[in-house]
Amino acid sequence: MPESLKNIDMRRELLLKRLKYDIPNRVTQALKEDLGGQVNPQMDITSKLFPQNQHIFAEIITRENGIFCGKAWLEEVFIQLDPKITITWLVKDGDLLKTNQILCQLFGPVSTLLSGERTALNFVQTLSGVATKVNDYVRLLSGLDTKILDTRKTLPGLRTALKYAVLCGGGDNHRLGLDDAFLIKENHIIALGSIKNAVNNAKVFNPTLPIEVEVESLDEFKQALSTQADIIMLDNFTLLMMQQAVEIRDKAVMQNAIQHRPLLEVSGNVTQKTLRSYAETGIDYISVGDLTKNIQALDLSMRFCDSRNEDIDASERLKTQSVSEDKWGSN
């Protein structure tokens, strides 16, 4: 397997490990925001209007097309409020959604379902919105080898969640944080004297981590090309400069002028209009901060039903269980 793909796979595994810790903690924090600093549905004064033994069915419905993400977060909300609440899932993370589609059915106390409604929807709407936007970008690159990457431009506290949503939308993850890859930028280069010094220092410090160098000109690109950097980021390059960078890299590889073939990443001035033309230059990655920075939540809602919706064929149900029975099932 190419080293670049190993790095992506390792990053995905690391992300999933971090999520096991992050999901319960982020859900707890969100519930406390809504419930007076406690994870206690009794703090919801409006829901106290209902008797605690009054149970009801509810459905989560999408009001627009999109890509679903957030199953584990919704489950965790109701695990923490009342693990006896049951959920019947009709979709899984990464599924294509159509307007008015039922995503899941819940059954439990009226008061508790209402207490968790907004927190659960906030997570699922946000993550599904990110997955949907990512998928829009990915589909624009149909037939090309270029991959879409996210960035560290994420909402505070939701880094791992948003990066998981990127995967559900068909994108790939850039580094998760400052600890899992080197990214040598302008100020690093200035402080260390040169691109070569920076890369050499990184290799000595930790030879197992990927090294990426950001360049702002073709001259800097040529300097980075002569090092052992794994990835070279072309920051705010014009389309012509991208084409030239690819040609220079490929020529150097063909002539054995460099010992390895670094991957090229484009960053800056990336929009849906420019995306495909950038990819057609032959670059390997396009990183897009907009994916996790400017989020448009998917329109979802929860509604109560008089009884279980019999229109849903039993064979379509992915699972019906107490959410506490399989806390870390299919995400």
Question: What are these model-predicted stretches?
Answer:
Residues 234:
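Active-site core of metal-dependent hydrolases
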Residues 2-227, 231, 243-248, 263-266, ...:
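Acidic/glycine-rich phosphate/pyrophosphate-binding loops and surrounding catalytic core
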